[in-house]
């Protein structure tokens, strides 16, 4: 093993004490890239001389191949270039500095390793780095260019320009995805023919200015310009071509191999190439072009390897070169396609607006402050990325299944416009409302402890059913303590019927009504039903509550909820447990409507029904106006919420997020639109208000409801029943 020490600069000799070892000759010979018109006897340092054409060739002559096989670490040798740095245009700094780096490193990487440059760049925040090579290339350089592409004796003039916006990721550079691949250099004039502005940076938009573009062999011209980063972001939306003088014309899909070393001028069409009908077609073309680039470049590279040389090469060298060529990385193509698609989609929605709205929009949009523009650009970028994630093209098969898709889409747009006028909403605010309502913005997850607690309390919730001589119905109730159950006063009215004297109510209820607490999956057996005693001492029509008493049937009463009383919450989540529409026992989680928002809520619901009256079929409560429900809106004894519980849920207990009993569900009005039932208003009266009214009306009953002896008696009776059931189960004899 021989050792080799790089001696590019004497000042670096002390830093490079570690000698580099030369590995043995193997078949994995590194494929070397040389510039055009390079003499055979050139010293094989990391820096290559470049002719005026700046074309990079992949052919390697016999002498260079032999040297590579003897020294495979040749490409690891350091390259260098000089530069001057002018941070302030008023103060000219003529100091010359030298930067070093490996051939595979980028220009920016070599500059960052220089202490002077790294120190000066700290003070140039939010500025573009403009690099001009003034000796050999005579053009503005991309900072991502590998050092192997630079001719020897390259000298850079580096200046800083103020960036207008911060959406570009720092310094504009293109990362070299595959340093082992051959690079192509060509020039593009910074000012276009038809459209003059083709670059992002104003400092580059000067007469006579040229941009030096580097690209990987096998790429298209369009891909190289889009990935360069210095051209305008919507360059992919236009039809353009590159001209060499007045003779040769190159299109977007032309290969960069054809323009190597040439100076080209861009001619952009005045009309944008992508209209609404061409968006999907263009996206598909870009996807296929990406695959073709990758496939074609690999084929060309393999053909280049297998092509025999006139001077002759061994099969081992050809085989090793074929193995050393890795497949191209498609990440930059994906980024390129994403960057091109975002402005297309934005342009599509802008073009879909009527002309008068576009004029208004253009008048309103003024150039904001720099900090404001930075925030706007970030928001636009995030929205575009989210739009791309959810963007999907519907194929013809799906469209045939939905022939009315366009009509439905127009109907939705019309509805949104009417809602914006009616509610005085901006499109952004309207979108955020729908996003909150339907986009899972509000977390509705429930802890397991709360679920277990609610499941235990559901044992106290009963299904009440009655049949008063053909007058049938059902409702919900719950056990408060002992055999006392709470339900709604209007439920009692439904049981006994109209124009029935109150003195007859207890007997009628006792004969026609029954309660079960086990209707959770299947219809309960007769043993699981409780009758009701002819007892009705306390009820209140204003608070809509009534207290009934269960008749003993040998079974223990369910546990009561009298220990779980809590004040009603002003906001947050609540849970209702009941039997909506006479169905099995269910739990509904919903949100509380704060007192100050009730006045906005109910008139809006009424307006919704009136505005969409032409689209409804029946049962729209058109008699409600903005003055409706004013007593309930400002009533502090009520708790308002949005629930899906409808008929049959009156008398359901309402629990807060901690599982405490806060209200008795009493009032709910619904209307039918089409085949769907919508809630108009839902109320429950707080348990604190109900208990205070009971204490004023019948203090002895209030004490009985809070008597611990009733609960103790029920617990002992429940234990006796469970022990009797255990004794009844006898073991089988063998």
Swiss-Prot record:
Superkingdom to which the source organism belongs: Eukaryota
Annotated stretches, region: Disordered: 1-32, 285-321, 712-734
GO cellular component terms listed in the entry, alphabetical order: chromatin; cytoplasm; nuclear lamina; nucleus
InterPro entries: Peptidase_S1_PA, Peptidase_S1_PA_chymotrypsin
A Gene Ontology molecular function term of the record: serine-type peptidase activity
Active-site residue list: 490 (charge relay system), 544 (charge relay system), 650 (charge relay system)
Glycyl lysine isopeptide (Lys-Gly) (interchain with G-Cter in SUMO2) crosslink site(s): 284
Residues bearing the modification N-acetylmethionine: 1
Cystine pairs: none
Keyword check for Ubl conjugation: yes
Pfam families, sorted: Trypsin_2
Top EC class, one word: hydrolase
EC number, as in UniProt: 3.4.21.-
Entry keyword set: Acetylation, Disease variant, Hydrolase, Isopeptide bond, Protease, Ubl conjugation
GO BP annotations, alphabetical order: DNA replication; proteolysis
Biased composition (Basic and acidic residues): 1-10, 17-32, 310-321
Keyword S-adenosyl-L-methionine: no
Organs and tissues of expression: Widely expressed.
Functional note: Serine protease.
Associated disease: Poikiloderma, hereditary fibrosing, with tendon contractures, myopathy, and pulmonary fibrosis: An autosomal dominant form of hereditary poikiloderma, a genodermatosis characterized by mottled pigmentation, telangiectasia, and epidermal atrophy. POIKTMP features include tendon contracture, myopathy, and progressive pulmonary fibrosis.
Sequence similarity: Belongs to the FAM111 family.
Protein's UniProt name: Serine protease FAM111B
Organism, as annotated: Homo sapiens
